[in-house]
Amino acid sequence: MAKKDDIIEFEGEVIDTLPNTLFKVRLENGHEIIAHISGKMRKHYIRILTGDKVKVEMTPYDLTKGRITYRGKT
């Protein structure tokens, strides 16, 4: 399990909604990843739509997947 120190944070924009609360996110550096919603966002029913600015956490072990931890103002 990754430690908190190993987490990499990126800003991005949701470009597509996929089934099972997965999203395709384009990061600020141009890469596209698949991201899921964090547990607290799911618990509080925070909705994410295409075009939303989000903050994504990734581990250095798999740079193709991430976790959405914050939804910014559109």
UniProtKB/Swiss-Prot annotation:
Pfam family, one: eIF-1a
Domain S1-like: 1-73
Listed SMART domains: S1
UniProt keyword annotation of RNA-binding present: yes
GO cellular component: cytosol
Protein name: Translation initiation factor IF-1
Keyword match rRNA-binding: yes
Function statement: One of the essential components for the initiation of protein synthesis. Stabilizes the binding of IF-2 and IF-3 on the 30S subunit to which N-formylmethionyl-tRNA(fMet) subsequently binds. Helps modulate mRNA selection, yielding the 30S pre-initiation complex (PIC). Upon addition of the 50S ribosomal subunit IF-1, IF-2 and IF-3 are released leaving the mature 70S translation initiation complex.
Localization: Cytoplasm
